A protein has these predicted regions:
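Basic/polar N-terminal segments that are highly enriched at the extreme N-terminus
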Residues: 1-3
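Short glycine/proline-enriched loop/turn "hinge" motifs that connect secondary-structure elements
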Residues: 60, 88-92
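Short beta-strand element of the alpha/beta-hydrolase
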Residues: 63-73
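Catalytic nucleophile-loop/oxyanion-hole region of alpha/beta-hydrolase
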Residues: 78-86, 98-132
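A fold-wide structural signal in alpha/beta-hydrolase
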Residues: 66, 91-98, 103
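N-terminal cap/lid segment of alpha/beta-hydrolase-fold proteins
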Residues: 6-62
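Glycine-/small-residue-rich active-site loops that bind phosphorylated ligands and cofactors
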Residues: 62, 75, 105
Length: 132
């Protein structure tokens, strides 16, 4: 049996990187800036639950490519709004960025999160043309 303390050390980046709050603050600042200065469609519902939303940062040029970003947090923390800071680099490169939110554990199961990602993918398939 694997020691739970070992797993916690290996999978909890907040324990591995004690200055994580500084990085999170930088992400929040960059994300707020991206949402306030860039063309974007925020909080588009792909499902009925409050957490089933996504943000679209459409590219102004390019071939219609899109990157779908599913935020980290080990299924139990963080939010799509924490990762809007990624948008400027992708949009400037001609790639639309879609940042997807999902329900967090323990309020939902991992199986439900997989279902949410399938629903988000289906929504994107149906609506992608409207975002270039």
């Amino acid at each position: 049996m694997i020691d739970p303390a070992f797993l916690s050390r290996e999978y909890n980046n907040r324990e591995l990187f004690p200055d994580y709050a500084r990085h999170f603050a930088r992400w929040q600042d960059g994300s707020a800036r991206a949402r306030s200065t860039m063309s974007c469609a925020l909080d588009r519902a792909y499902g009925a639950s409050p957490g089933e939303t996504l943000d679209v940062f459409p590219a102004r040029k390019g071939d219609g490519s899109a990157l779908v970003f599913i935020h980290g947090g080990y299924w139990r923390s963080l939010d799509k709004r924490d990762f809007s800071f990624l948008a400027p680099a992708w949009v400037d490169a001609g790639v639309s960025l879609v940042v997807v939110n999902y329900g967090l554990c323990p309020n939902v199961t991992l199986e439900r999160i997989v279902q949410q990602m399938l629903a988000a993918s289906a929504w994107l398939y149906r609506h992608a043309e409207g975002y270039g």
